[in-house]
């Protein structure tokens, strides 16, 4: 902060009394900002001089777009996509995230294969433009997350409100990554497992209810079935997490094993299951909404089967 105030005295700074994490920091800071569009930008992101133009034009000319983002490149290997964002993200049926340009540990070079403007499931919070009115209507980022996966949850909620998340490929930014927690941190692993479950709990039932209504079910029946289906899906995800935890233990990583255990414990403490009545009311008010970018099945299994050919199949696999 001292450097900012000294080197860039014309920039307004907002000081918080403590570290509220990625989520709480943005939520509290943006309360004091009056603008039509918010730009969420990490301190470890390098941007070109003309990067804002395509973003602002997209937001001005496309009212259906609630948020948009550039292609996120690796600062270390500037022609390769960055792990946590790449050219826009998807999730599979269990909530595991992956990207155009990054699946599991496989990362592509940017050869122009994603130079089309595309609507995706989520975009990286490292560099994300959001309509301020929509950000406030949705209550901002979920403060329970602290950090990690909050942008996926936000983009999911944004789509449920009927807005699109769009990648604007005319510009690229370069992200160092790992600024909050290093990749090897057990705390990072814990947050990822915990927040993935919170994200599913926030959004699955409402998504299922809208799908069931479009399939011809009345809203009351759709809400009941959606809530039960969401609970079963989350239980399945927790079972998969348990298998992963056992694998960590067998490999001798007690810290990773305990990270999963703590993640599930914190999820039970922080989680809030939506009521059937709330899900029904939401489905009645959002019958036209559609969530794009959720792949049926498991990205892990599909990647094991297809290897690097999985990148050629992403458009057909993700609805």
Protein language model annotation of sequence segments:
Residues 115-172:
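A short, conserved alpha-helix in the catalytic core of glycosyltransferases
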Residues 38:
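Short aromatic/hydrophobic "clamp" motif used to bind/position activated sugar donors
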Residues 46-96:
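Conserved donor NDP-sugar-binding/catalytic core segment of glycosyltransferases
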Residues 15-33, 43-45, 54:
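Glycine-rich, basic loop-to-helix element that forms the pyrophosphate-binding segment
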Residues 1-15:
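Acidic donor-binding segment of Leloir-type glycosyltransferases
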